[in-house]
Amino acid sequence: MDVIVFHHALGLTPGVQAFADRLGAAGHRVMVPDLYQGETFDSIEAGVAHAEATGFDTIIDRGVAAAAALDDRFVTIGFSLGVLPAQNLAQTHSKAVGAVLCHAAIPLGTFADTWPGGVALQMHNAPDDSWGDFEEAEALVEAVPGAELFVYDTSAHLVTEPSLPDHHPAIADQILERTLTLLASVS
């Protein structure tokens, strides 16, 4: 299965690349576009400031442009900020067959009024994560038949990012395993 992974506000960190590499080791063809064009940040706040200065529409456009290189059906994966292009593609691209949205959610209606039939949705979020848009995740899962919401007992945001104190290896491993399950189900 082709997979396109979109990084969080820190940029294309070694942690994001390592997650993608683990998907590749499981036999998937993985693309990890750099939406920040080489820049990385040490804090969420600095990364968000960069994203705001760049423009969220520009970040989405870069993600959509990267997906043009995919020749086959694909699954999008987005971590926090990366949910913007991931969800956009899942809702609007004819070759998207699934989305894994981690640590964020965008309201239905932002990119399209409905979730397309036949596009699987898996979400990973924590109610106590102040950056995580948990209520939006619940609303999206409620609106999409067959969607899954995995809830984690933490207030940390980027639990999958090893370079941060928020990193939670056990949760990161659960997210990876559940992602692999979704990929197997749509392959």
Regions found by a protein language model. Give the residues of each.
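Serine-hydrolase catalytic machinery in alpha/beta-hydrolase-like enzymes
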Residues: 1-71, 159
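Short alpha-helix in the alpha/beta-hydrolase fold that links the catalytic acid
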Residues: 19, 132-142
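Alpha/beta-hydrolase fold nucleophile elbow
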Residues: 70-79
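Gly/Ala-rich beta-loop-alpha elbow adjacent to hydrolase catalytic centers
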Residues: 78-82, 86
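A conserved short beta-strand
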Residues: 95-105
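Short, proline-enriched alpha-helix->beta-strand connector loops that line the catalytic pocket
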Residues: 115-121, 145-146
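Short beta-strand/loop motif that positions the catalytic acidic residue
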Residues: 123-125
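C-terminal catalytic histidine-bearing segment of alpha/beta-hydrolase fold enzymes
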Residues: 147-187
